[in-house]
Amino acid sequence: MSRADQERGARRPAAGRRAAPENPPRAARAGRGTAVPDARPARTARTARTARTTLRPAVGAAGPRRLARRARRAWDRPLTAYYLLLGGSLLITVLGLVMVFSASQIEALNSGLASTYYFRKQLVAAVLGTLLLLVASRMPIRLHRALAYPTLAASLFLMALVQVPGIGQSVGGNTNWLNFGGPFQLQPSEFGKLALVMWGADLLARKQDKKLLTQWKHMLVPLVPAALLILGLIMLGGDMGTAMIVGAILLGLLWVAGAPTRLFATVIAVGATLTVVAFTSSPHRMDRLRCVGATEPGPGDVCWQGLHGIYALASGGWFGSGLGASMEKWGELPEPHTDFIFAVTGEELGLAGTLSVLALFAALGYAGIRVAGRTEDAFVRYAAGGVTAWIMAQVVINIGAVLGLLPIAGVPLPLFSYGGSALLPAMFAVGLLIAFARDEPAARAALAVRPAGVLQSARRVLAGKRPESTANRARTARTARTARTARKTR
């Protein structure tokens, strides 16, 4: 054995015996009775803090990207449209009730009524509308389709009844109301919008099932003649605003149906021609057209309403003068609780309030487009497109008039302005969208595994059953999906 091997063997510890550390801990060097803490944990903590400080800019740079990914995943979830429609519509309705309460008190007192008269009527309509929304959201699609033809027939009958002398009532220069005695009045043309959406969607869906929509005559007939009949009955009463919305619904249905560009452009040209004729044939409508962008009341104060709507918005500032503190509603601004409630909202809640209202309507529009784009059911696609076109067109016409960008058309802000005749069919239409959003396959699966709510658990307890667990709900959903897949395979 060489001398180097002998030295290595001397340094190697014996078997079963642990080598003593060359640098014993400080506690051992200090003696048995003293305990000096080890400095290595402190150095480790300082090293970790230094590493976090060094990496902090990189984490901050990745933060916006991470938030963007999370937001994208949230928007792509199966129940996004369902919650946007349900939450957005209820928030708009509640905020509308608050603004009707604020904007209508002076108007009611000037009319010799109780200050809360209009608010109480709107509250009753909102409760009934919420019930209609819930009923429509739970109805199966086949029942929606079954109601299409009766709804159209009833709407046409009531709209024709308005034109009978002694029955129809004129409000604001338009003869489009039915008075059923007392404070209860009905505007049948509002239900005509809903009827056109449901009937038009069912008609186009049937034609698509028969492969007939590739022919232009099947795409136009009888949809366009029926829409022209509704438009004619509305224009007999002089309601140009509602006629424009019905035209927007027709264009929305044709667009979703995939009408050729030439056909679509022809329909738009005919509609524009009829609109020009309607404006030029009425001096009152021409006065409203001249008031677009006006800065003075004009002769006879024809632009008074639009001008004071701009004043209300301009005086609101960023956060408004405070709820109930509007000055324009004190007799200066006509119709502050109906057509120009958005102006009062801007004055009392400021730019923040108006942008919030716009954001809620934008959420409804996005959800409607998403439902129409993701479904495989033809009726759902056409009905969702029609309802979305209806609500968005009405929002644009109302807010455009308040901003002075469009002529005043006497159109209320959907789900927001005072008026039960406008609120009830609009909430039923939103209920249709909610039902369509629930009917998506991914949404059904997500709802099946969602934890049971309080009412569902209480119902099971009262029935003598134990509350269903999440695992059981997931198992039930998987079984249902397997059964549907098996049926499709067969």
Summary of predicted features, one role per range:
Residues 161, 230-238, 315-319, 397, ...:
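Transmembrane alpha-helix interface/packing and boundary motifs in multi-pass membrane proteins
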Residues 174-183, 331, 406-414, 424:
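Active-site-proximal inter-transmembrane loops
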Residues 1-67, 71, 399-490:
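A juxtamembrane structural motif centered on a specific transmembrane helix
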Residues 75-79, 215, 219-220, 330-333, ...:
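Helix-boundary and loop/linker segments of multi-pass membrane transporters
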